[in-house]
Amino acid sequence: LTYDILTKLKNVCSDDIVGLRNKLLLQLGYETMRRRSEICQFRFEDLQHHGNHKHALLLRHSKTDQYNQGKIIPISNELSEMISSWSLAIDQDSGSILRSFKRNLSTNPSLTPASINHILKRLQKQAGLNQIGELSGHSFRVGAAIDLLDKNIPLEKIMLRGGWKSETSAMRYLQSWNDSNWLVVN
């Protein structure tokens, strides 16, 4: 789920409350490069505002942080504003940021990791992006890592951003891109 695909998916999101949540999900997943379970655990209380218009989210726990030391993840002004707008739209300022909906469009306490895959598949179909393979929660990590690689960001920085502790893990995400790197021999 590269930036180009992210843009296409956001463009098919409706303007209602569900579409607002879906746009937020897409931006949150792409920018943070987190696993589905980690995306679902972000809370409104985790949003931090620092000097010079810098914003971050606290990731309280991850697969590679078994001691719950947490990690500060810088985010864009756009994402910070999206979280604030979402908070106002659902009239909540605590608890899980991403939420599912009941039939009457009131919110449930939290979106589930499995729901992320369902939402991505639905948006992918609406955007007519069936030729790229099935999107899943891992697509955020892969696409953002590929975008960083395309910008010539060093592997070490990509690893830090994505939370990979070993080059082997990071390279698995980037391998498919490297295998088809559009190399042309003249």
Question: What is each model feature region?
Answer:
Residues 3-36:
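Basic, Lys/Arg- and aromatic-enriched nucleic-acid-binding interface segment
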Residues 9, 25, 33, 39, ...:
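Mobile genetic element proteins and their domesticated derivatives, centered on retroelements
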Residues 15-20, 110-112, 134-135:
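N-terminal core-binding DNA-recognition domain of tyrosine site-specific recombinases/integrases
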Residues 29-53, 156-160:
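Short, charged phosphate-coordinating catalytic segments
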Residues 50-107, 119-126:
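Basic, alpha-helical nucleic-acid-contacting "clamp/cap" segments
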Residues 92, 117-160, 167, 179:
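Short, basic (Lys/Arg/His-rich) helix/loop patches that form interaction surfaces
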Residues 162-186:
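Catalytic-site neighborhood detector that most strongly recognizes the C-terminal catalytic loop/helix
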